[in-house]
Structure formats: structure tokens, C-alpha cells
């Protein structure tokens, strides 16, 4: 991959971190409300 520098590394980490937190939050909320048992 060519490092063009158009996207800051901290921005990629921030978006990735928010995505992981959102997925974990939805999974915990789904399992807490009983919807996670159907997955």
C-alpha cells in the first residue's frame, strides 16, 4: 500500500475503535434484551 498521507493514522484508529465499540455495544445490548440468543 502506498502511504499517501491523505488519511491520518489517528483518524483510522478512531473510526476503527468506534466501530468496534459500536459492534460490542450492539452485541451486549442484543444479548441483554434476549435478541442475541437467536444469533
UniProtKB/Swiss-Prot annotation:
The chain crosses the membrane at residues 9-29. Its main location: plastid. Pfam families: PsbJ. It comes from the Eukaryota. GO terms for cellular component: chloroplast thylakoid membrane; photosystem II reaction center. Keywords: Chloroplast, Membrane, Photosynthesis, Photosystem II, Plastid, Reaction center, Thylakoid, Transmembrane, Transmembrane helix. It is a single-pass membrane protein. It is found in: Plastid, Chloroplast thylakoid membrane. One of its GO terms (biological process) is photosynthesis. The keyword Calcium does not apply. PSII is composed of 1 copy each of membrane proteins PsbA, PsbB, PsbC, PsbD, PsbE, PsbF, PsbH, PsbI, PsbJ, PsbK, PsbL, PsbM, PsbT, PsbX, PsbY, PsbZ, Psb30/Ycf12, at least 3 peripheral proteins of the oxygen-evolving complex and a large number of cofactors. It forms dimeric complexes. One of the components of the core complex of photosystem II (PSII). PSII is a light-driven water:plastoquinone oxidoreductase that uses light energy to abstract electrons from H(2)O, generating O(2) and a proton gradient subsequently used for ATP formation. It consists of a core antenna complex that captures photons, and an electron transfer chain that converts photonic excitation into a charge separation. Belongs to the PsbJ family. This is Photosystem II reaction center protein J. It comes from Phaeodactylum tricornutum (strain CCAP 1055/1).
Amino acid at each position: 500500500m502506498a502511504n499517501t498521507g491523505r488519511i491520518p493514522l489517528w483518524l483510522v484508529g478512531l473510526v476503527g475503535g468506534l466501530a468496534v465499540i459500536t459492534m460490542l455495544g450492539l452485541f451486549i445490548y442484543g444479548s441483554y434484551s434476549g435478541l442475541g440468543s437467536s444469533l
